[in-house]
Design a protein with these regions (language model features):
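Thiamine diphosphate
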Residues: 1-144
Length: 144
């Protein structure tokens, strides 16, 4: 029997995002100043022209992603759950869901196990917030 190497879900996201970018040139990635933490750096290093760093501007992250979807791109936006959807929920509701744009929202660091980041980075309400938005599909991966 072979022992499977365990990886974090954010590592799985980074590898999956990179694979999606290889398979489809319309895939773009956006980050709100947490590129390495969410592992979007794997995509950014391979496809720098298809990566946008919006800085600490989570509301703008959602609006830019929605605009890119309107012109035919497939945006994957990444941040910690406390910031997206925690900080930009209204933009997600209005610019992404209301307009029914094809935006993928990937949030890491949900729950209370945020390590040294502490209470200011804990998010317990992310799934509840997203589930009430019409046309929103929510996945919560457990293993990679």
């Amino acid at each position: 029997m072979t022992k499977k190497e365990l990886k974090s879900t954010r590592d799985g996201f980074g590898e999956g995002l990179l694979e999606a970018g290889i398979q489809n040139e319309n895939v773009v990635a956006l980050s709100a100043d947490l590129t390495k933490s969410t592992r979007a750096n794997l995509f950014a290093e391979k496809f720098p022209k298809r990566f946008i760093q919006v800085g600490v501007a989570e509301q703008n992250l959602a609006s830019v992603a929605s605009g890119m979807a309107v012109i035919g791109k497939i945006p994957f936006m990444t941040s910690f759950a406390i910031f997206s959807p925690g900080r930009n929920w209204e933009q997600i509701r209005t610019t992404i869901a209301y307009n029914n744009t094809n935006v993928k929202i990937a949030s890491s660091h949900a729950g209370v196990a945020t390590g040294p980041d502490g209470g200011s980075h804990q998010m317990l309400e992310d799934i509840a917030l997203m589930r009430v938005i019409p046309r929103m599909t929510v996945f919560s991966p457990a293993d990679f």
